[in-house]
Amino acid sequence: MGDWSFLGRLLENAQEHSTVIGKVWLTVLFIFRILVLGAAAEEVWGDEQSDFTCNTQQPGCENVCYDRAFPISHIRFWALQIIFVSTPTLIYLGHVLHIVRMEEKKKEREEELLRRDNPQHGRGREPMRTGSPRDPPLRDDRGKVRIAGALLRTYVFNIIFKTLFEVGFIAGQYFLYGFQLQPLYRCDRWPCPNTVDCFISRPTEKTIFVIFMLAVACASLVLNMLEIYHLGWKKLKQGVTNHFNPDASEARHKPLDPLPTATSSGPPSVSIGFPPYYTHPACPTVQAKAIGFPGAPLSPADFTVVTLNDAQGRNHPVKHCNGHHLTTEQNWTRQVAEQQTPASKPSSAASSPDGRKGLIDSSGSSLQESALVVTPEEGEQALATTVEMHSPPLVLLDPGRSSKSSNGRARPGDLAI
């Protein structure tokens, strides 16, 4: 039948650049097709025409009946099948060898340029790289050519054409011979005078070989389908996923924020020197306990204090419950101012028992602000506001004015910081 060693060497080279399923397919091709066809099948079909006999003496009748019974010999049919299904693999091998050769030429050009620029050939310089730095390396860690890009497309087309050839030859074998050989074949073809009976040698053994080669072809077809799923379908599915959701891979690796970020509608995080400023004060039914302010002096100074918000002209809608909120804020600022300046000018109102009682009530009311009822909008603002108990920026204006006449509002003559 011929020597299959040359085709075997070529396919062995292609096996080095195939996937795992491709290597299994080539192993099946080597062992169960080429070796079986060369070792056993040729011996079974060796006496095929000589042992094909018909019960007639008409010249030429036996030949035409054999031609009708076997349009093509099984051996030659299977040989053509092996050649056709191996051709796409050989084309893929040619593409691999072309890429390897182009890489070798590129290295030779780099060495030639290096030798031309540096006669000492590489002392103090590395060879130039003509390719793009973004191009992936041609070989992997094991020194094998990577199946990617144009080479991957060639490999996929290789599998597709192998599958088509397998299906075509299986269908052709069914229409030509069927899957079973009968020992008796009746022929009425010219020049036979009438219907003659012809007999096939070793029909059972030949039927076994036909079924075996058909099973090997079906196994190769299944391997091709698995490899198409492994390469083509997975790559196609990955490409469609990346097309409709390009940030899916980044979202899987992106860490989640432990806390939600503050929106633009919320206030910025600032440090203030007085209690949190709520737009809706507590209901008058909430009663504050008179708790003394620790370390507070007995007589607050008579100073007019202008805060930074008042100087910038910010108007906050404040709803008073019997003037309690405004009085608390004024008393708080007076106490802070008294801590920063020595108490040299005690006022008559502060030294009186009524003034001392008012101081205790005001300090207790200011400390009770944290226990007031808070709306959801104010709760969101409180989360984004850092409250620190320290002195706010103060402006001392008209120290001689009495606290009874001051109402905490900004005057044209006040100086704001």
Swiss-Prot record:
It is a multi-pass membrane protein. Keywords: Cell junction, Cell membrane, Disulfide bond, Gap junction, Membrane, Transmembrane, Transmembrane helix. Residues 110-128 have a biased composition (Basic and acidic residues). GO terms for cellular component: connexin complex; gap junction; plasma membrane. InterPro entries: Connexin (IPR000500), Connexin46 (IPR002262), Connexin_C (IPR034634), Connexin_CCC (IPR019570), Connexin_CS (IPR017990), Connexin_N (IPR013092), Connexin_N_sf (IPR038359). It comes from the Eukaryota. Residues 110-141, 247-267, 334-417 are annotated as: Disordered. GO terms for molecular function: gap junction hemi-channel activity. GO terms for biological process: cell communication; gap junction-mediated intercellular transport; visual perception. Disulfide bonds join 54-198, 61-192, 65-187. Structural component of lens fiber gap junctions. Gap junctions are dodecameric channels that connect the cytoplasm of adjoining cells. They are formed by the docking of two hexameric hemichannels, one from each cell membrane. Small molecules and ions diffuse from one cell to a neighboring cell via the central pore. Belongs to the connexin family. Alpha-type (group II) subfamily. A hemichannel or connexon is composed of a hexamer of connexins. A functional gap junction is formed by the apposition of two hemichannels. Forms heteromeric channels with GJA8. This is Gap junction alpha-3 protein. It comes from Mus musculus.
